[in-house]
Design a protein with these regions (language model features):
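Conserved catalytic-core motifs of GNAT/GCN5-like acyltransferases
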Residues: 128, 146-160
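Conserved GNAT-fold acetyl-CoA-binding loop/helix
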Residues: 27-47
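A short helix-loop-beta-strand connector motif used in the catalytic cores of GNAT acetyltransferases and
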Residues: 47-60, 78-79
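A short beta-loop-alpha structural element at the N-terminal edge
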Residues: 7-21
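Conserved beta-strand in the GNAT
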Residues: 60, 67-77
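Conserved acetyl-CoA-binding loop-helix of GNAT-fold acetyltransferases
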Residues: 103-120, 138-142
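Conserved GNAT acetyl-CoA-binding A-motif
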Residues: 121-132
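Conserved acyl-donor/pantetheine-binding loop and adjacent beta-alpha core of acyl/acetyltransferases
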Residues: 73-106
Length: 169
């Protein structure tokens, strides 16, 4: 897998066809790596991606050539999903949340670029993932995130909740 200098920008409706391709590839990758249930029933749907765009929380990663190779949702402020946790958050200070991180698999470094960019926006990040998503769990641990407990996602299923307070380095 090649690496490329990536740019992060807000997604637009013109990105939608490519966003659907990228998320389909990410769904397939999750199934191939033992996580066939986290993004079930075509999630994230076109409607979810459109809502992210409309609310200004949808982002893409693109190569120097302008090809979209990744996408994610990033929002600042309270996420209703994180109000109740079986466990304890590291901090109740204002935070950002990352959802729906997806890679086309064409270039490396998508997740590292996304998390780095998000920490430039706010030094307190929360994220959650499915118990079967070993790839994301490993990545989050490698990036210094701490397991804080379990939350119930919007689909009614439990997720492992992580948080990291960025202090530089």
């Amino acid at each position: 897998m090649a690496t490329s200098k990536l740019t992060i920008r807000r997604s637009t409706l013109t990105d939608l066809p490519r966003l659907l391709e990228v998320t389909a590839r990410a769904r397939a990758f999750m199934a191939e790596t033992g996580n066939p249930t986290q993004w079930r029933d075509g999630y994230p749907t076109e409607a979810v991606l459109r809502e992210d765009i409309a609310l200004g929380r949808g982002y893409v990663c693109q190569t120097e050539e302008g090809r979209v190779v990744g996408s994610f949702c990033f929002a600042l402020g309270e996420d209703p999903t994180y109000r109740e946790i079986t466990g304890t958050w590291l901090s109740e200070e204002p935070y950002g949340v990352i959802h729906r991180l997806a890679s086309s698999g064409e270039v490396g470094g998508i997740a590292r670029s996304v998390f780095g960019w998000c920490f430039e926006q706010i030094p307190n990040i929360r994220v959650d993932t499915h118990a079967d998503n070993r790839v994301m769990q490993s990545l989050l641990t490698h990036l210094g995130f701490v397991v804080c407990g379990t939350i119930i996602a919007g689909d009614g299923y439990p997720r492992i909740a992580y948080q990291r307070l960025f202090r530089g380095g």
